[in-house]
């Protein structure tokens, strides 16, 4: 028995509903939504997690380099120095890396409409 009742006018947002905010990335999940009212509109603040598009046989993930630029690291899945046992964190050659880059993105909706950027 499902005791949760979803208000039918509230949308279910999927990663495919939004455009990636970072060139060359894909949105893999939408997390931790928070709703607020501002200027007569309903706002939604989402945590958006993006990663590089994956290639067959490789694991790729974004990092910020020393120049504060996003850089993509990519390794063969069969590399003995790679530990990908946790899908959130990649360990390579003793160094831990997050598999996605997350940021906050606001969306808004006017009464009765869907959310927009």
Each language-model region and where it sits:
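Beta-rich carbohydrate-recognition and catalytic domains
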Residues: 1-117
